[in-house]
Amino acid sequence: MNRWLKNMLHNEAASGVLIFLAAVAAMLIENSSLEPYYNSFLNIPVAVQFSELKIAKPLLLWINDGLMAVFFLLVGLELKREFLEGQLAQPANVVLPVVGAVGGIVGPALIYVMFNYTNPVALQGWAVPTATDIAFAMGVLALLGKRVPAAIKLFLLTLAIIDDLVAIVIIAIFYTSDLSVGSLTVAGGAIALLFLLNRIGVKGIAPYVLVGMVLWVAVLKSGVHATLAGVVLAMAIPIKGETPEHGSPLHALEHDLHHVVGLVILPLFAFANAGVSLAGLGLNVLLEPVAMGIGLGLLLGKQIGVMGAVWLANLLGVAKKPESLSWTQLYGVALLCGIGFTMSLFISSLAFEHSGAQVVAGAADAGHARLGILSGSLVSGVLGYLVLRFSLARKG
């Protein structure tokens, strides 16, 4: 296994552990006497002003709109590298994970719609169970130790990367508010400048970051979700340095961001968004359509969608299952894809907490959504771990 993959897996495993601890801490605090301090912390007003431009948001939204843009910058860098020189650069390696990812998106979405098709507010959350939390999934794999074959890790990583790409498209198309033509014009100019910098051979990161900040503000003001600015910025970062000795600007930035995102931003995001009140929690809450749709979408929709699509593609000869992977191991991976957690929480915040005139209904659905995300992700992770542990023990 190459050095990049080893570093990636090590970082994702550590990140998964921290995300889990942050989520547990948030839930414990939310259900203790410290709850007022927790919510006051998340609602601290933070304002940034430059001349006539002012951005004022509570801390929670700075985390969700600002820090998560850095996360999506990293996702974009990984996607670009993978498509240009990684596993996704070889078409034969892409087909099966793409098929699995598509199945893993359609399956959960259909299950969610089955439970919520009569409620237009709840229906906004159809994309919540389609996400996969790569850091958490790799963290579960890390618990199995060195006996996990590289093929399992590569398949899960590739599928999750493609899943991230689809999530970006979903956010861009379905979770945008009223658009501002003026801000979109500024954003378009910033994008053009980014790719002009790439075209004329600018290799330093600083000019891209400065223009990227302008792009983020413009996208934030435009009505399109600001995190997408991170993806666009990533596409403009050059992958080749001035000389082979100087190294790749893209690789350098990706390396620098991995630890910041995995060990700081994602755990902070989990801490800020995973606080679910368990007061009055009973079977009736778990059976709410939004909670059921998301929980079962992650638990059943993901495994049925991924496994069904992969099995059908293999049967029809569209793509072949790697000989080094058993069907039981692929099933374990499909279960791990049901760990939506941070990505699902993020999409949930877009679907329900920015619901405009339907704030009350959206807020209620947001609480049920978080419960569904946590329960579905937890059960998927435990079952995925047990299935893979069993299959690897039999093989050993």
From Swiss-Prot:
Compartments where located: Cell inner membrane
Transmembrane segments: 9-29, 59-79, 95-115, 125-145, 154-174, 177-197, 200-220, 223-243, 260-280, 281-301, 332-352, 373-393
Reaction(s) the record says it catalyses: Na(+)(in) + 2 H(+)(out) = Na(+)(out) + 2 H(+)(in)
Molecular function as annotated in GO: sodium:proton antiporter activity
Statement: the UniProt record of this protein carries the keyword Cell wall biogenesis/degradation: no
Swiss-Prot/TrEMBL keywords: Antiport, Cell inner membrane, Cell membrane, Ion transport, Membrane, Sodium, Sodium transport, Transmembrane, Transmembrane helix, Transport
GO terms of biological process kind: regulation of pH
UniProt topology in membrane: Multi-pass membrane protein
Stored Gene3D superfamilies: Na+/H+ antiporter like domain (1.20.1530.10)
GO cellular component, one term: plasma membrane
Main location class: membrane
Coiled coil: none
Similarity comment: family membership: Belongs to the NhaA Na(+)/H(+) (TC 2.A.33) antiporter family.
General function of this protein: Na(+)/H(+) antiporter that extrudes sodium in exchange for external protons.
Classification via NCBIfam families: NhaA (TIGR00773), PRK09560.1 (NF007111), PRK09561.1 (NF007112)
Name of the molecule in the record: Na(+)/H(+) antiporter NhaA 1
Species of provenance: Magnetococcus marinus (strain ATCC BAA-1437 / JCM 17883 / MC-1)
